[in-house]
Amino acid sequence: MAASKETMQFQTEINQLLQLMIHSLYSNKEIFLRELISNASDACDKLRFEALADPALLTGDSELKVEVDFDPEAGTITVRDNGIGMNRDEVIANIGTIAKSGTREFFERLSGDQTKDAKLIGQFGVGFYSAFIVADRVSLNTRRAGMEAEHGVRWESDGTGTYTLETLDLPARGTEIVLHLREEERQDLLSAWRLRSIINKYSDHIPLSIRMRKIGEGGKPGDEWETVNKASALWQRSKSEISDDEYKEFYRYVSHDYGDPLTWSHNHVEGRLEYTSLLFIPAKAPFDLWDHNHPHGIKLYVQRVFIMDDAEQLLPRYLRFVRGVIDSSDLPLNVSREILQGNRVIDQMRSGSVKRILGLLEEMAEKEPEKYQTFWNEFGRVLKEGPGEDYSNREQIARLLRFASTHTDTDTQNVSLADYLARMAEGQDKIYYITADSFLAAKNSPQLELLRKKGIEVLLLSDRVDEWLTSHLPEFEGKALTSVAKGALDLGAIETEEERKSQEETEKDAEGLVERIKNALGERVETVRVSHRLTSSPACIVLGERDMALYMQQLLKQAGHEISSTKPVLEINPTHPMLARIEGEKDDTRFAEWSALLLDQAILAEGGQLEDPAGFVARINQLMLALAG
């Protein structure tokens, strides 16, 4: 095939990323080798898996390996593998663009502080681009397994905005990356001892042979190769043999994270079912956590043979932040994603892994509450999806939930349902909560007025997932979760007989006003009634017990969902001066304006959106003019 060479532009974000890495990650520059070896190992894993269906892919070179070489005279370090390789389109997709979500958010969060930015960059995942931390030019030669030699591809760039692509003959499959080191890096990195120490530090656990040339006469690399890592599956070793540092390095390998994990669980299960799991909980949420199109899951091995990344069937979506591996002895080597669906072995491993993770979190919450709070701040909103997805573990998940509450009146979500139960008032038989589109909207909601006056704690829920959560978590330890903004407020034994009688008298006295407002508002409301939850506000909106909060209805409508309209109930406080003013209004037209204004204000306070904002403003202006003059 005739060679064809063209110059192409990097995706804009890569340009920025390259410059940031060179400056922010320089203090930990040796991670470039970890990242390149990790990618090479993944390429070999993928070839091993594809070869299960097509053994011819391994023809002529069945021993999968990674080689690290260096040339002091040329000033280069080479990392090569005989894995799956890439074709031209894959090179453009994997090297010329960033396929991850959250790119824009990533750049918005950069602060200019090198230490903080280094952590963010690592959290985003640097991968191949880390080569430019130490190199001023990088060449990549690759050919995909199963393609002819003439379909080789050469990619080359100096990291300044463009790269070249060239077609060439490559006799061997796999990928070779050549780093042309910056002048100032050569003395430090171009030695066998230095490179081996980096490999032993970061990549000892990779279950694949990493080879370097044996050192010959004069300290120069010879012609023979030797394995320089342990090349054993870390998860198969006994826990007592593995140091915390080894666990942390393995986490970085399996997650492509830059920092340490928050905690981990390593288990060997024996009996009717045999498998090993090594599961990590990250300390920081990845940028693609909320990207539903991005695959999430853990690595699946069968008898130490890599089968697939992102095996979503092994953990439910509400635990998608977990990283790690599961190695089974009870699955066939030719297992596919289709076979994983409804597989008994998979179901049992999934169930065991879920219980292990939830147990790990419970132990952390009990023994290390500050550490658990760190976890909650990063992943709490994801865990809130659990009761709706995993009915069998709903109670255990509920014990792990944390909320803001009127007990502290801060937006910190650190109140558990058990904490709430321990503080319940005498005679209280419900767990009260309110949902809103922001913490301040929840905290300042008029629906809380009576409960605050009585000293009854209310959970303040302002995450978008909270409406979903409460619809799937009706009770906790026998106490019903009850919204103070939906249905009639029943305080049960908390209310005295005198209070009930006073309410009945207020209702009777306000019958005429209620009927008049109801007639004025017509079809805009389900009904109008006297409120027993207001003490200082003139009115509030109350929804049906099964209705969705107004702000959630609005969000779903904006997203294009068909939402059936529900009419709110308007509750009024007849003792409020504004209601006294309305009641004394003799002009029916002006009374209707006051009533509409009362409803509009209540809708806004509830987080709803007015159908006619201009009409609302006009009514305010008219009433202000009337009062002024």
From Swiss-Prot:
Where is it mostly found? cytoplasm
Segments for region (C): 555-629
Q: Which domain of life is it from?
A: Bacteria
Q: Where is this region: A?
A: 1-337
Keyword list, A-Z: ATP-binding, Chaperone, Cytoplasm, Nucleotide-binding, Stress response
- Kindly give the InterPro entries that the UniProt entry links to this protein: HATPase_C_sf, Heat_shock_protein_90_CS, HSP90_C, Hsp90_fam, Hsp90_N, Ribosomal_Su5_D2-typ_SF
Q: Which intervals of the chain are annotated as region B?
A: 338-554
Pfam name, any one = HATPase_c_3
One GO cellular component term: cytoplasm
Location relative to the cell: Cytoplasm
Gene Ontology molecular functions:
ATP binding; ATP hydrolysis activity; ATP-dependent protein folding chaperone; unfolded protein binding
Q: Which Gene3D superfamilies match?
A: 3.30.230.80, 3.40.50.11260, Heat shock protein 90, C-terminal domain, Histidine kinase-like ATPase, C-terminal domain
Membrane-spanning parts: none
PANTHER family recorded: HEAT SHOCK PROTEIN 90 FAMILY MEMBER (PTHR11528)
Q: How does it assemble?
A: Homodimer.
Q: Which family does it belong to?
A: Belongs to the heat shock protein 90 family.
Instruction: Give the function comment from the record.
Output: Molecular chaperone. Has ATPase activity.
- Protein name according to UniProt: Chaperone protein HtpG
Lineage summary? Bacteria, Pseudomonadati, Pseudomonadota, Acidithiobacillia, Acidithiobacillales
